Amino acid sequence: VQEPRKWTAETPELYTLGLELSNPAGLQKDKIETVIGFKKTEIKDGVFYLNGIPLKVNAQNSHMQHPEEGHVMDEATIRKDFELLKQFNFNAVRTSHYPPVNKYLELANEYGLYIIDEVGDEAHASEWISSLPEYEEMYRERCRRMVLRDRNHPCVLFWSAGNESGEGINITHTIEEGKSLDPTRFWMYGGNAFSHPAEDIIGPRYPTPMELEMQVGIGEDSRPSFMDEYLSVAGNAGGALDDYWEAIYRHPRLIGGAIWDFVSPGLTERIRQVDDLSPFHTPAHLMGNARLVKEGKNTVLDLNGHDQWVEVYRADNVELNSNELTLTCRIYPRKLVSSCGSVSYT
């Protein structure tokens, strides 16, 4: 291909590569096909370029997590995720904190999403084994498996040497191993320090907009910067997004960042409803893993007071005119199959 159409998130141009195995007589014995793309990444004067153009990366972190199937995401779910990401103007995903299934990368090639592909060596900042020589080969082996499998996917923008696994020499070994197998891509590392000496693309993670401005925008480290995690959107968080991106657009060395995170990982649990026999009919649910226990001749509902409780949601049709509320509960264990009891207000 003399002048290939370049692959980007905006123009996901793909080509089919076919390989045939023939015997000396010219008879075909085997044939395989795969999809590839052409692109080129560079770092010049601290700026990250894709196909000769400075690139800004607006990413999300995402676990391989399904509410019904656990760590198994079917194609329909992946497509739904990618369509939502594209709809809201995200152009990248950091696969926290391990390589995704192969179908994930195939669809990223198709949809046009940059992937920051991550080695699965997380120690989550509690057991740092990256300085121990007996773990070096494990770091290298996990890196090899990822790079050898994924290096032909055009969606892989750059690699990550892992997440929160300390700052030891094994991180350097991981990056060395990866570069020996794929010299065309750059490396970052999701550590909790500002940067690691071996990475091509530095952090920080979770800076304030002012810290991002001071540490990177006018800092002395000349490497490009990517916030592999920032703006943790738990609960009602997510403020100051515009402040971050004003800094990112103001300084060419700032590539962008990956918001934590796209989908909160969790499994669907059965919620048992509690009937409100008062005139208010307020929604309430039995939460946790409360159990029925024998108490003398009776069977009662045991709530331990920590992770088991009856949760009563605020209802607009309930008006309280004082600082006191009396809650009366009447429990009928035989109804636990469909409803776990009754709640009445007095």
Name the predicted role of every residue range.
Residues L21, V119, I331-P333:
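Short beta-strand segments enriched in hydrophobic/aromatic residues
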Residues V1-L107, Y111-I115, R142, L157-F158, ...:
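Secreted/periplasmic carbohydrate-active enzymes, especially glycoside hydrolases
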Residues F82-L85, A92-I271:
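Substrate-binding/catalytic cleft of secreted carbohydrate-active enzymes
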Residues F38-K39, S344-T346:
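Short edge-strand/loop segments of extracellular domains
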Residues Y15, R253-G256, D261-D276, G288, ...:
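Aromatic- and carboxylate-lined catalytic core of secreted/periplasmic carbohydrate-active enzymes
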Residues E13, I32-T34, G46, R185, ...:
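Extracytoplasmic/periplasmic beta-strand context in beta-sandwich domains
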Residues V274-D275, P283, M287, R291-Y345:
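Extracellular glycan-recognition modules
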Residues K29, L55, P279-A284, Q308:
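Short, isolated positions in well-ordered beta-strands
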